[in-house]
Amino acid sequence: MRFSDNLAKILDKYENLGNKLSSGIMGDEFVKASKEYAELEDVVAKIKEYNKAKSELEEANNFKLEVGLDNATLEMIEDEIHTLENSLPKLERAVKIALLPKDDADSKSAIIEVRAGSGGEEAALFAAVLFNMYQRYAELKGWRFEILAISDTGIGGYKEASASIKGKDVFSKLKFESGVHRVQRVPETESQGRIHTSAATVAVLPEAEEVDIQIEDKDLRIDTYRASGAGGQHVNTTDSAVRITHIPTGITVALQDEKSQHKNKAKALKILRARIYEEERRKKEQERADSRRGQVGSGDRSERIRTYNFPQGRVSDHRINLTLYKIDEVVKNGQLDEFVEALIADDEAKKLLGIYSKNTA
């Protein structure tokens, strides 16, 4: 089917859905039609803009052929034709991107987990820096950042930390943060001024609701124990800490941040549900990605994705070869949008290339 025919079908479907909604349908039929109609609004707006530019270009070319036009009018028409010819490829690409299959999880909130990697205490300090960076970014975006658990080292570092980030399309913005982040800087304890390299890993999971993942009580093993602080000392005398294991998958979550066992259990279940949902997503995505290497969801988190070089004041994303020389704005102020938008654009380009290659093979 030709591209233009496909667009015409979408416009017809949108119009039919609009007529259907105006006809007085009710109940589940109305809910289903409303959802479909809303999902098409963005792509329909882009199709109409694209078709309008095509129509205007055709009219301008026809007008140019008319006899008796003066030079000033011809020059004006040629300028318009030049402008329209330049805009059409961009408008067509915008339509194609809008038509790309959507990740069902993109609209969801997210759970972010940061863990210290290689590098000892310096890695733990860097993990804390990353965690705070994401908190600043969430504040800039107007999202709600709720700390779920922090395992600190006692001197400002985090062995691991997790948070729930609630808002519209959070996962679509943060999903490319998953991977190994590397830092290069001179530790405060380094007397010789030598640069040390350490790392932390970030995992971003779509926050799953109960409707997304049904967890049976019989599939859970719940252990309780006394919470411990830094150095292993017990910080309270009740069994408030909780460890929940999902028996079918072997996924385990342990939480001890709250003094209440009930609160620890609720938070642990939230993280567990997200991890199970992400595991199922990755399996399905892997099946789809077998024929398009390099797509999000390939399951490879071992690759270093970004380096934060403090002496040079730069942050480099190795996946898209983007380097920004404003490390304080990124790390301290959470200004991540340049990376986020570039990564989204790169992902869209790869998907378009995959579809094009598939259709022309």
Swiss-Prot record:
Biased composition (Basic and acidic residues): 280-293
Alphabetical list of SMART domains matching this protein: PCRF
Region (Disordered): 280-307
Maturation and modification: Methylated by PrmC. Methylation increases the termination efficiency of RF1.
Name under which the protein is recorded: Peptide chain release factor 1
Residues recorded as bearing N5-methylglutamine in the entry: Q233
Entry GO terms, CC: cytoplasm
Keywords recorded for this protein, A-Z: Cytoplasm, Methylation, Protein biosynthesis
Source taxon at top rank: Bacteria
The keyword Protein biosynthesis belongs to this UniProt entry's keyword annotation: yes
Gene name, Swiss-Prot/TrEMBL: prfA
UniProt xrefs under Pfam families: PCRF, RF-1
Chief place of localization: cytoplasm
PROSITE patterns membership: RF_PROK_I (PS00745)
Family: Belongs to the prokaryotic/mitochondrial release factor family.
PANTHER family: LD18447P
Any one GO MF annotation of this record: translation release factor activity, codon specific
Protein location: Cytoplasm
Summary of the function given for this chain in its UniProt record: Peptide chain release factor 1 directs the termination of translation in response to the peptide chain termination codons UAG and UAA.
